[in-house]
C-alpha cells in the first residue's frame, strides 16, 4: 500500500510539472502573438494612472476593434500592486474598477509566466486550444536495462489556434509604458 501511495504522489507531482510547463508554453505563445499597445481614448487624461487603468486602456482599444476583452493575465506581484494602492496620506484607495477578482469586468488570471510589469488583455474567444490527456510512458535506452533503470516521459499534445484576423483581440502591454501614455502631460 505504501509503495502505491508513493507512486501516486510521484505521478501527481510529475503530471503537475508537465501541465505547468504546458500552460507556461501557451502563455508564451499568446504573449508573442499579442498586439502592442498604440493609443487609447484615455491617453493624456489621467492624473495618477495605475496598473488597473493601464489594463482598462488596453481593454478600450480591443473593444474598439469589435472584440470583447474579457480576460487579463498578470504576474501575481502586479495584481497585488493593482489591488492595494494608497493616496498621498497613506490611506487605502478603493478602486471602483477592481471588484471580485476582476478589473472592469474582466477576469484576472495570475501567472508567474508573465513578466513583472507586463499584462495580457484579451478576448478569450479568439484562441482555440485542443489537447490530449496527460500521457505517461516508461522505457529504457542505452545501458539502462543493464543498470536496472527506466526513464519516464510525461507529455501533453496541444494545438493552439488563432485566425490572423483575430490577433488584434489580444494585447500584450508594458504597464509602465501604458501608464506613461495615460498621464496628463
Placement of each model-derived feature along the sequence:
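Protruding loop/beta-arch "assembly-hinge" segments enriched in small, turn-prone residues
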Residues: 143-185
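Composition- and surface-driven signal marking solvent-exposed, interaction-prone regions
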Residues: 6-7, 85-88, 164-171
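Extended oligomerization regions of viral-like shell subunits
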Residues: 38-156, 161
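Alpha-helical scaffold segments that mediate packing/assembly in large oligomeric complexes
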Residues: 1-64, 178-185
Amino acid at each position: 500500500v505504501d509503495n502505491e501511495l508513493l507512486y501516486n504522489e510521484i505521478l501527481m507531482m510529475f503530471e503537475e510539472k508537465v501541465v505547468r510547463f504546458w500552460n507556461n508554453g501557451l502563455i508564451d505563445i499568446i504573449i508573442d502573438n499579442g498586439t502592442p499597445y498604440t493609443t487609447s481614448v484615455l491617453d493624456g487624461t489621467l492624473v495618477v494612472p495605475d496598473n488597473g487603468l493601464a489594463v482598462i486602456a488596453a481593454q478600450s482599444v480591443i473593444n474598439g476593434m469589435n472584440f470583447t476583452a474579457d480576460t487579463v493575465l498578470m504576474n501575481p506581484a502586479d495584481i497585488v500592486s493593482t489591488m492595494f494602492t494608497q493616496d498621498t496620506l497613506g490611506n487605502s484607495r478603493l478602486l471602483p474598477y477592481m471588484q471580485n477578482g476582476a478589473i472592469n469586468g474582466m477576469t484576472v488570471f495570475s501567472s508567474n509566466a508573465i513578466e513583472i510589469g507586463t499584462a495580457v488583455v484579451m478576448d478569450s474567444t479568439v484562441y482555440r486550444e485542443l489537447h490530449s490527456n496527460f500521457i505517461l510512458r516508461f522505457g529504457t535506452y542505452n545501458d539502462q536495462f543493464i543498470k536496472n533503470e527506466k526513464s519516464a516521459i510525461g507529455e501533453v499534445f496541444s494545438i493552439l489556434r488563432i485566425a490572423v484576423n483575430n490577433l488584434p483581440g489580444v494585447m500584450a502591454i508594458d504597464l509602465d509604458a501604458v501608464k506613461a501614455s495615460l498621464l496628463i502631460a
